[in-house]
Design a protein with these regions (language model features):
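Low-complexity, Ser/Thr/Pro/Gly-enriched N-terminal "stalk/linker" regions
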Residues: 1-51, 55-58, 66-95
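Structural signature of alpha-solenoid helical repeat scaffolds
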Residues: 44, 107-108
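Residue signature of alpha-solenoid helical repeat architecture, marking inter-repeat boundaries
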Residues: 47, 111-114
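Residue-level signature of alpha-solenoid helical repeat scaffolds
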Residues: 54, 115-118
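Mid-sequence acidic-hydrophobic segments that form the walls
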Residues: 80, 119-120
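Acidic/His metal-coordination segments adjacent to aromatic residues that form catalytic metal sites
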Residues: 96-103
Length: 120
């Protein structure tokens, strides 16, 4: 089977209707700029933000419609980065008695940022 490029395809009929519903869902409160940074309560920095950006980008490619909040979300997420350029705490392997003492890396932080990189 030969795949169809979404550059040359605009979904119509049931598929178009479903794509429209999904695009509308991505404009709900939890995917808006004012809340997207607060949605991850499970300790996966970059995960919710990245999945949101990726979903908006892919939906725009499919529907050929500009997402309402994409650029604003990207701006907010990029502004929230720490001084090393990523979201969440800095793990530097030092032992200062804090919650990140001795940690060099956080698996959830790495995984969450993979979604963010794909979306950007």
């Amino acid at each position: 089977m030969k795949p169809i490029s979404n550059q040359n395809y605009i979904p119509r009929g049931n598929l178009g209707a479903r794509a429209g519903l999904l695009a509308s869902r991505l404009e709900m409160r939890e995917y808006r700029p004012e809340t997207v940074l607060n949605m991850d309560q499970a300790g996966w920095p970059g995960d919710w933000e990245g999945r949101t950006i990726l979903a908006l980008v892919r939906m725009a490619e499919t529907t050929k419609k500009e997402p309402a909040y994409l650029h604003e979300i990207v701006d907010i997420v990029l502004a929230a980065r720490n001084e090393r350029g990523y979201l969440g705490p800095i793990y530097d392997g030092t032992s200062d008695g804090g919650t990140n003492s001795g940690a060099r890396v956080n698996e959830q932080q790495l995984s969450g940022h993979s979604w963010l990189l794909r979306g950007l």
